[in-house]
Amino acid sequence: MAEKLEREVFGTTKDGETVYRVEIKGGGLTAKIMTWGAVIQDLRLEGHDAPLLLGFDNFADYPAHSSYFGATPGRCANRIGGGKFTLDGKAYQLELNEKGVSHLHGGSDNIAKRNWTIVEHDVDRVVLKIVDPDGRAGYPGNCTVQATYRVHGNGEFSIVYESTTDQPTLANVCQHAYFNLDGRDDALGHDIMIAADHYLPTDERQIPTGELGPVAGTAFDFREMAPMERFEGGEQALYDHNFCLSKERTAKRSVALARSVNSGVSLEVRTTEPGVQFYAGFKLNVAVPGLDGRKYGPFAGFCLETQVWPDAINHQGFPNAVLRPGEVLRQETDYIFTKN
């Protein structure tokens, strides 16, 4: 049985719920996890002074200013075009919470913006759970999501998300951490590799067109380590796209690598998921200081969100995003940090 450890009161939600923060530690990593949004609030590597991700020292800054820093959006992360889908012959209309034209991350009151319950807490791991009720944001079924965060002996931070439902529904949760491996004002001094031959081109709403775009010969080709800051046609490339790792969920494998040329800290990403959303953080402009007083402007951090492809329910040939009663959706991702 897991040892019961201390929970720190970190804040209070708008509904008066107490937000707790717990610490897990091991393998050179120290992580602080918040019940609100199952947020990784802080993550540090022994021998490296700066935090590895973006966040805030005060809870009140999260609901006011966070762009999903360290959070777990869902029940269906990323975008659904027009908020529309058909499942088992029934049409559904979801909340249009992005510019009134698209559905994003499960709605305006999604699980990244609500308080989770701590199920277990040990020295090196914490388990949290939340129920997304039937009808919220237009989704069918009561969907239960459990998150297990654990640190291991080789600088590894592992995540297991497990989702169940009592009605057929959509399910796809992800970790939305913004990484910065050197603590500088922007993360453009990083090299990155993504093991994908294709990416998903998008329209003006950032909804996939349905095509699979070959990365070869484009600024999206990260099959070998390359600078994150790239230019195409004389303009800086702006990344907020899904990279296609496979057509279905697989055994866990290495899919991405990021490295700070300034600090020597590297991040390897291993996952079961068929896609990874690479977002370079170019839209960031946070009005208040972040961890350690840092300012978060454009490119302050980057995301590698392991996931089902966005808008998958509306595109034939995209990976499955449907969860049915009796099934358990298990999504696993490891973030492995090393310092030269």
Indicate residue ranges for each PLM-predicted region.
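An exposed, glycine/acidic-rich loop-and-rim segment of catalytic or binding clefts
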Residues: 2-340
